[in-house]
């Protein structure tokens, strides 16, 4: 059983998937930082200097705090600012992945166009012999 597992893990597809997951997780952190540290502060400055992560609506009258962390301690909240930030993360990540896939597809198409045409394989010996016999008979 251990040998089967080792064979499964050593297959190329599994290793490629593992590398993809690790790189994807690291790339996700980069996108999170881009959105949280660069894009959202600019958007927040445009809309009055507020942090989007602190945009919320209290779902009960007991919630009267001004920060999301304090509001969550007081009761249920609808934290739409956090959702906006996460949705923006997703859109940026999806767009970057789209651009990467598009670039890879374009590269594959270009390589296929530039690939020289492979010469046709010679016919099998019996077919070549029959063709030669046919040609000799046609000349008579």
Swiss-Prot record:
Short name of any one Pfam family annotated for the protein: MscL
Top-rank lineage group of the source organism: Bacteria
Alphabetized InterPro entries for the sequence: Mechanosensitive_channel_CS, MS_channel, MSC/AndL, MscL_channel
Subcellular location: Cell inner membrane
Predominant place of localization: membrane
Keyword Ion transport: yes
Keywords carried by this UniProt record: Cell inner membrane, Cell membrane, Ion channel, Ion transport, Membrane, Transmembrane, Transmembrane helix, Transport
Single GO molecular function: mechanosensitive monoatomic ion channel activity
Assembly and binders: Homopentamer.
Family the UniProt entry places it in: Belongs to the MscL family.
Protein known as: Large-conductance mechanosensitive channel 2
Biological classification of the source: Bacteria, Pseudomonadati, Pseudomonadota, Alphaproteobacteria, Hyphomicrobiales
């Amino acid at each position: 059983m251990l040998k089967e597992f080792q064979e499964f893990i050593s297959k190329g597809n599994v290793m490629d998937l593992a590398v993809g997951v690790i790189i994807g997780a690291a790339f996700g952190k980069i996108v999170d930082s881009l959105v949280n540290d660069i894009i959202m502060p600019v958007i927040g400055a445009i809309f009055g200097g507020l942090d989007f992560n602190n945009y919320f609506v209290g779902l009960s009258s007991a919630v009267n705090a001004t920060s999301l962390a304090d509001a969550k301690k007081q009761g249920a909240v609808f934290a739409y600012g956090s959702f906006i930030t996460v949705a923006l993360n997703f859109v940026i990540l999806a767009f970057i992945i789209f651009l990467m896939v598009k670039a890879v597809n374009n590269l594959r198409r270009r390589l296929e166009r530039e690939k020289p045409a492979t010469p046709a394989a010679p016919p099998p010996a019996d077919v070549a012999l029959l063709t030669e016999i046919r040609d000799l008979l046609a000349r008579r």
